[in-house]
Amino acid sequence: MNKTLKIATRQSPLALWQAQNVKIRLEKHHPDLTVILVEMTTKGDQILNSPLSKIGGKGLFIKELEVSMMKGITDIAVHSMKDVPYEIPQGFKLGAILKRENPFDAFVSNDFSSIDDLPQNAKVGTCSIRRIVQLKAIRPDLKILDLRGNVNTRLKKLDKGGFDGIILACAGLIRLGFESRIKQQISDQQSLPAVGQGVVGIEIRENDTEILDLIKPLIDVETTYMVSAERAMNARLEGGCSVPIAGFALIDNEQIMLTGLVGNVDTGVILKEQILSHVSQAEALGVELANKLISLGAKDILKN
């Protein structure tokens, strides 16, 4: 008997690519399964003239998708994990974390080959406070301008002029076939990635064991540990998108190394710590790192 599964997705090209990728993989694992994409416009997609931090944060990109699952219109939602708030609403859970792709930030420009190559007082576009605080640390002279919209929209804005360069996520550019636009992959030393960057996650209804069984083959265990550590740190710090928090985990030989950062965009103060543990302690590691940052004054920065 054929089964049908409906995926809730945003309408942006990147969101559709990610949902389509999940559809292809699910249908490959389950030949009797038909997967349908249900496209939706979210509040985050509609309000483009204000920074995310001022209009309610990245949760604006997923609320409508969760409502559709709650009503039974759709069965799962596919998200970029860096857009998923650390608190998942009651009645939902993350059912699968997929294998991490390129987690780094990208410098994109039509005229300059790297951030170092930019002239004094160059104009750089980004809407991420995390990127702004780290960019200012390496190039305090730069003029940072707000840049909203999906990947295609941001590239068009760059091409029209007004920016000497823009900062985007490598993963999004690569997924959409824009890898050639990347002039510089920015190292994690210069720009520590966002929590969950480069990772796609699948959200499901909390007690939906049938759906959980269907998506299980897509789970990547190593990435799940990494994202668990990063999100545990973020949750302990109570970090939304209005504060500059970065968290990035790496795994080598069952050891997980987590680097965390909290910054103050006004004063330029940056707190950065790194700790190591066994992968089985991923979540506890995230909490421990957050506590270290708190002991250095992270909460004072986040309050402001």
Curated annotation (Swiss-Prot):
Modified-residue entries (S-(dipyrrolylmethanemethyl)cysteine), positions? 241
Q: Which reaction is recorded as catalysed by this protein?
A: 4 porphobilinogen + H2O = hydroxymethylbilane + 4 NH4(+)
Q: Has the keyword Transferase been applied to this entry?
A: yes
The UniProt keywords, alphabetically, are: Porphyrin biosynthesis, Transferase
Entry cofactor note text?
Binds 1 dipyrromethane group covalently.
Pfam families given for it? Answer: Porphobil_deam (PF01379), Porphobil_deamC (PF03900)
Could you name the Gene Ontology cellular component terms for this entry? cytoplasm
Query: Per its UniProt record, what InterPro entries does this chain match?
Result: HemC, Porphobilin_deaminase_cofac_BS, Porphobilin_deaminase_N, Porphobilinogen_deaminase_C, Porphobilinogen_deaminase_C_sf
Please list the GO terms describing molecular function.
Answer: hydroxymethylbilane synthase activity
* Highest taxon of the lineage: Bacteria
Q: Which cofactors are required for activity?
A: dipyrromethane
Q: How does it assemble?
A: Monomer.
Q: What else is known?
A: The porphobilinogen subunits are added to the dipyrromethane group.
Q: What is the protein name stated in its UniProt record? A: Porphobilinogen deaminase
Its ancestry begins with: Bacteria, Pseudomonadati, Pseudomonadota, Gammaproteobacteria, Candidatus Pseudothioglobaceae
- The gene from which this protein is expressed is hemC
